[in-house]
Amino acid sequence: ARFSSASLRAMLRVGAGVFASCLLNVGSLNAYTFVIGILYPMATLGVYTQADKWSKMGYASLSQIFNTTFLPLLSRFQEEKERFVRAMRKSNRVTAFIACPVSGALIVMAAPIFHLLFGSKWDEAIPLFQILVARGLLIVLIAQCNTCILALGKAGRFVGTEVVKDVLMVGALFASLPFGSVEALVWGQFFASLLTYAYVIYITVRVTFVRLLQYLADLTPYLLLT
């Protein structure tokens, strides 16, 4: 096999895009911890940290599994429109089939799970955990869209969606501060992620070969069942 500088440059662009998006994501999420730590007692920060940590364990693991599974598969078909569409739609259905019911179950069973693991020590974290799990579902769906974008080598678009996500997160932080509660801050994260998801769907439909109605048809049944 011959060395290809064009392939190397493409790989570097994708890698740099993923790295930049990770930095942006870490910065925006740490902003919430920083602000809560300044404005609220340490006990309140502890409640938020517990809810955030346990919610991340679920959606971060799912996102990683889906990304490592579907990115190589979809990348194989980036030059074959029909096969890419079939593979993308199937990957979207698999993602929704797993992520939607898991998230729904965690939200419904949040109180029993926390009581089983911690007794009543972290009861204040339960409502925050439920909101963050709902947000986590959106993050998984956003990550799946980004996987499809990356599979086509559109690293610039991918970084663009991450910038939009982090700008909305920071904007939601400042918009929810006047409400004076950590729960309001967490709801801000949820609505920022909802807006991000709408934007990412728009970008995904533009850069891939899947139509909006096809995308919605693949996900809606699982969302409604959840």
Regions found by a protein language model. Name each.
Residues 51, 55-99, 146-151:
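Helix-loop junctions and terminal segments of transmembrane helices
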Residues 88-140, 170-178, 226:
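Alpha-helical transmembrane segments of multi-pass membrane transport and lipid-handling proteins
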Residues 10-14, 18, 34-56, 85-87, ...:
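Interfacial/gating helices of multi-pass transporter permease domains
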Residues 34, 45-46, 158-159, 185-186, ...:
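Alpha-helical transmembrane segments and their helix-entry boundary regions
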Residues 31-36, 40, 50, 66, ...:
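Hydrophobic/aromatic end-of-helix segments at the C-terminal termini of transmembrane alpha-helices
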Residues 1, 21, 25-29, 52, ...:
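Short runs within selected transmembrane alpha-helices of multi-pass transporters and secretion channels
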